[in-house]
């Protein structure tokens, strides 16, 4: 597991080193409406039969990223808690055409690598058929423990 995580992080760092200043601004997230939480939890299930022809709309992607790691308060705090508010997580999206880093402050995607790198970041065949692979990567330096983890 540590080897796989190390390889994935190395690949992401390589993507970052190759990055261009290309940015994709996302639409504002829809913060009201939707399915009630308890209903969503009761319907939650894993589906490994992914249709490669289906894709998320920009609005769906915006909502998903904001819910996962967006900023929901004026002081910059997030929708998801982090220990001691260190905000050590980076969220990456790897898709058919490119890999991106989610910039929560700008609610945008920053290009880190062109091309389809899904097979390089997942060993699970079903994931390669999905529209996006979401990667949460922790910056150990922000955690206060350095490389101890």
Mark where each language-model region is.
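Amphipathic, heptad-repeat alpha-helical segments used for oligomerization and assembly
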Residues: 141-149
């Amino acid at each position: 597991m540590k080897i796989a995580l190390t390889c994935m992080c190395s690949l992401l760092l390589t993507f970052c080193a190759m990055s261009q200043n290309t940015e994709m601004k996302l639409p504002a997230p829809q913060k009201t409406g939707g399915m009630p939480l308890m209903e969503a939890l009761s319907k939650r299930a894993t589906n490994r039969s992914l249709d490669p022809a289906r894709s998320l709309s920009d609005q769906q992607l915006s909502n998903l990223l904001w819910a996962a790691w967006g900023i929901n308060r004026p002081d910059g705090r997030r929708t998801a808690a982090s220990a001691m508010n260190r905000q050590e997580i980076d969220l990456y999206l790897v898709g058919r055409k490119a890999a991106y880093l989610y910039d929560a402050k700008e609610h945008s995607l920053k290009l880190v690598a062109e091309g389809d790198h899904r097979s390089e970041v997942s060993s699970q065949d079903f994931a390669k058929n999905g529209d996006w692979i979401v990667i949460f990567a922790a910056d150990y330096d922000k955690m206060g423990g350095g490389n101890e983890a």
